[in-house]
Amino acid sequence: GENLLALDLAQVQRDLELQPWIEHVAVERLLPGTLRIRVSERKPIARIVGFEPSGGKAGFHLTTFFLDREGHAMLPPKNSHVSAPEGARLDRLPYVSGVSGTEIRTGRRVKSLQMDSALQLVEEFARSPMSGLVDLDVVDLSLPGVLVVKTRQKNEITFALDGFDRQMRHWRLIHDLALREGRQVATLDLSVSNNVPARWQEQEPERPSAAVSRPAVDYRRKHV
């Protein structure tokens, strides 16, 4: 094998950190003949659909990417590399939509003030009083200055770009009020500090329940 003393550890670290799923690498030489490498992986918290340049070909193709908390884009891992619990978690991650001109490069950050706020919202939601009560489905960035969150429970919640802790607590208060009155929130605008506009979901007559399955997302690349 290669002489361990001649190995450029900094180059080894740089080469490994070029991999999109790797956040940080620590490389240590342990004489007489051991190389220790510690790897920290990026944790996906959201998904986004965008155009990736076609490798070696002109044009782009439509692809689903994962985003970590800093907005680094990663292609989905192969199914054989993912445990069943982690695969189920990835399938529940919310989508970020409404990003104009979405050209995405693997390993690069998707950067904007709204994107940073959207990823912060997703992170803070997991620690909020609403976690476990509703499931985030989409975080829409198409309106300037706000984030519009759609849940799988058919709620549509508008957030300001900061102060998520206060807004989440306000959401919980209104959620609990709706439960006490036998209602569900349809729309709620938390981006305003006073007189929060809210609308209830229409009450539907009871009908026999039917199992509804959510279609699985196909992460395979689609050419357009």
Residues covered by each model-derived region:
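Charged, solvent-exposed interaction patches on well-folded alpha/beta domains
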Residues: 1-3, 10-18, 24-224
